[in-house]
């Protein structure tokens, strides 16, 4: 449908039936959530004008957008007052880089026009703060909103640069061109719809704490864990020497290499151990008392170890206990593959959470 603005500070609604996202990462009640994006003629609230506030909200089982438009170049107080009235109905205010730009800009404008608006009762949710943490995971050159939209497959109707938008608005004020108005509205409409479409990026930090192990399968070379997760924004793949991850929708699969070889286990209280050079191992001093002094020496941090041949899997990076070290050229930290780690249970889930925490931090 065509977007129209009929008067100064006009309200323009558009129904949205084509966006389905999981908003539970923000609230279990979609009606509590307000998405917003602003359009201005500059970055400084003291030296520029606010000409459009786009709002997205859930109503009657659908997302809708509302545009508060400064149609005559003089209606900033009116659209700000309407915005202040509108946000009072919501508990969460969702934006992209809004904590840095949109909200401070609006606060300054509210002060300029002496408009009473408190953000104390509404919680800001800035998706940019989450998406920037996963720039490397998704191999992004930048984390602009449009880059994140590309990952979820969102397609804009038009793309107009910021400078072009400002010129279009100034020209609209002179001519009242319906084509320019349509461009201005469509761009902001895309901003709001795009913002809604990337909501599920907020689920990424929840993965570690909320995943559940569904299945465990084992081959000679790998162990594969299948887990349920919160709704994911897009397919996620990750590969390193210690694990491979493939995740999509509400499921994550992690493939862990299995190795059978001899590894070293180091005793932390090395001062209580003696090293036996002939056997290339350390034993506790209570046992060393029965060993001839010519066949033993006090252990150091480097020699206070025993060697065990078993089946191992990589240890999480921050795991400190029961660590075995590869004696080969590649090195590495490992855990013994116990029965608990090959069956569904809390030990397995904790292991998976610890392994993937380096990815979904």
Q: For each of these PLM feature ranges, what is it?
A:
Residues 4, 43-47, 137-140:
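Short glycine-biased active-site loop of nucleotidyltransferases that positions the nucleotide triphosphate
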């Amino acid at each position: 449908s065509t977007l129209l603005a009929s008067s100064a500070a006009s309200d323009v609604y558009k129904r949205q039936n084509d966006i389905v996202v999981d908003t539970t990462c923000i609230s279990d009640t979609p009606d509590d959530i307000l998405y917003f994006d602003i359009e201005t003629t500059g970055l400084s609230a003291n030296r520029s004008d606010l000409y459009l506030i786009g709002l997205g909200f859930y109503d009657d089982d659908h997302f809708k957008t509302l545009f508060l438009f400064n149609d005559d170049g003089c209606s900033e107080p009116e659209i700000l007052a309407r915005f202040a009235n509108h946000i009072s109905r919501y508990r969460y205010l969702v934006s992209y880089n809004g904590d840095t730009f949109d909200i401070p800009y609006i606060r300054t404008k509210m002060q300029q026009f002496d408009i009473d608006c408190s953000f104390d009762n509404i919680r800001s949710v800035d998706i940019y703060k989450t998406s920037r943490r996963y720039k490397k995971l998704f191999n992004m050159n930048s984390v602009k909103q449009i880059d994140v939209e590309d990952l979820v497959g969102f397609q804009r109707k038009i793309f107009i640069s910021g400078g072009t938008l400002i010129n279009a608005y100034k020209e609209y004020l002179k001519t009242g061109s319906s084509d320019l108005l349509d461009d201005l509205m469509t761009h902001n409409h895309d901003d709001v719809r795009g913002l809604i479409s990337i909501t599920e990026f907020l689920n990424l930090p929840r993965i570690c704490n909320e995943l559940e192990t569904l299945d465990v399968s084992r081959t000679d070379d790998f162990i594969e864990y299948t887990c349920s997760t919160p709704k994911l924004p897009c397919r996620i793949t990750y590969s390193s020497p210690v694990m491979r991850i493939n995740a999509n929708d509400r499921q994550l699969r992690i493939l862990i290499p299995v190795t059978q070889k001899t590894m070293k286990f180091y005793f932390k209280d090395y001062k209580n151990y003696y090293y036996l050079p002939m056997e290339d191992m350390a034993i506790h001093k209570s046992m060393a008392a029965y060993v001839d002094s010519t066949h033993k020496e006090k252990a150091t941090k480097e020699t206070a170890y025993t060697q065990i041949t078993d089946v191992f899997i990589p240890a999480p990076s921050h795991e400190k206990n029961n660590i075995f070290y590869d004696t080969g050229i590649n090195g590495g930290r490992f855990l013994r593959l116990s029965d608990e780690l090959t069956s569904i249970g809390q030990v397995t889930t904790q292991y998976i959470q610890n392994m993937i925490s380096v990815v979904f931090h």
